[in-house]
C-alpha cells in the first residue's frame, strides 16, 4: 500500500509536466543555491525513500520535473537528466545517511591502524579488524568484497560492462602524541574515539582517510539502492600502508590489474593533478659518553610522532650541573626569545620547569601536515634555537650536535634557503624541508626532516645535494654526521576530457567555488596508479588537519563529500568515454 501511495504522490507531483519531452539535455541543472534551498525544505522527505524525496524535490523546483519524470519512467538518463538525478541522489544520501556515516567513521577511528614496529601491517590485528569492518559493511550494502591478503580491501559495485574505474583511499593512520590532544578550553580528547565538538569531528583518521572511506561506502550503497544503472564497475581499493610508503599497493599491483582511470580521495578539492615528491632526510650523531661531573647535558629530546607531521610540542630534558641556575637562566631568557621569533612564523610558547635533578623545556607551537609547514609553527627548531641562544653551556653529546645542526642549517626556515637548496616551480610551489622528529636509536641521535620536492629537480640530484651540504657543514663544524636521504619523485599529469571536467563541474556546482585543477604538496598513492587524480577531501581555503594533533573533519565538509562522491560515482560510472 505504501508503494502505491508513493507512486500516486509522484504522479501527482509530475502531472504538470507529463507532456514535456524526456530528452531534456538543454533544460539545465540545479546548482548550489537550488540545492541549498532543497536541503532547507526537504530534511523530513529524506527520511523516506529516494522516490518520495524526488517527488518532493520536483514539487519544490520545476527545473527538476522532467528529470524526475524520466527517472520514474525508468528511461535511460543522459545529459542534464543524469546530472540532476545524480545530484539529487547525492543530496538524499547526505540527508538520509549523515548519522550513519558519522557512526561508521567512529567505528573506523576506534581501530588504531598505526603501523607497528615489530608486526608487518598485513599481520597486524588492527588492520585485520579494519578489513572485517569493511567486509561487514559491504555485505550489508549488497556490494562485492575481496580481501587481497590484508594489503588491500576491495569493494565493488558492478556495472553492466567489464570496464572499471577505481576509487582509492587508505585505512592506515599516522601515530599520535596523546598529550597534545587537548582543546583550548582544556578538554582532553582520545585520539581514537571520534568526538564531536560543535561542528567538528575529532579523531585520528577523521579526515585522513577514514571519513572518506565511510562516505564513499555509503555513496556506493545509495547508488545501488537507487536502481540507477552503471556502465562501469566501481572498484573501491582501501590501502593499508599509504602513510609508510605504499608497500601494500605495490603488492596489489603485482597481483591485480589496475583500472585504467582512478580517483583518489586523499588530498584536496577541486582536482589534484600534480604532487610533490615526499622524502625523509636523516642526519645522525653519535650519542657519546655521559657528561662529566658538573656539566649540563641534554639527555632527551622529542618532536613529532612521525616524520610527516609538524609537531605541536617539542621537549628537551637537561641534567647535570646546577639545575636551579639552568632553570633560572632559561626562564629569564624565554620572554625575549619568544618576542624575537614570533614574527618568523607565528606565536609559540616556552615552559621551563625544574623536576628534581632535571630541567624540562617544552616549546609549544602549532601542528600541521608535514607537506604544509607554512600552516604550522614548528616547535622543534625553535627549541634548538632557544637552547643555543640561552647561553647555557651544554656538554657536547649527540643531542648538542643535533641542536647545532638544527640551528645552523634550518632555524625557522623550511624552504631550504639556509642549506642553499631553495627552488620553486610556478605551479607546484617551493621545495620544503621541515625538521619534525628527533629520536634516540641504536646509540645515535637522529634528526628526521620531511622533504617535499616539486618539479625542477630529481630525487637523485636533490639527495646528492643535501648529503653534500650536510657533510660539508659537519666537516666545517667538526661534527661527525651520518646522512641518509630517501627521496620520492614528484608527479605532474595533464588529464583532459570528460572525467576531469565531470569532477570539476561536480565540485563547482556543489560548492559555488572556483573549480580548476590544482597541485598539492602532499604525496599520495596516486603516483602508483595509472591516470589517477585526487578528488578531496580537504576544502580550499581551510587548514588541512591530517597528521595534526587534534585532527578533525568538519561535519559540513563530510556532508559535501557524501553529496559529491555520490554524484561522481553515477556520472563517471556512465560516461560514454573518459577522455
Please place each PLM-identified region on the residue numbering.
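Acidic/histidine-rich catalytic neighborhood of metal-dependent amide-processing enzymes
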Residues: 209-288, 331, 335, 413-427
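Acidic-glycine-rich active-site phosphate/pyrophosphate-binding loop
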Residues: 179-196, 285-287, 292, 353-363, ...
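C-terminal motif of bacterial Sec signal peptides marking the signal peptidase cleavage site
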Residues: 14-16
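Alpha-helical metal-binding/catalytic segments enriched in His/Glu/Asp
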Residues: 167, 195-244, 282-289, 314-324, ...
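Positively charged n-region of N-terminal signal peptides that target proteins for export
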Residues: 1-4
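An extended, acidic, His-containing surface patch that forms the Zn2+-binding/catalytic region
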Residues: 20-35, 364-448, 452-468, 473-579
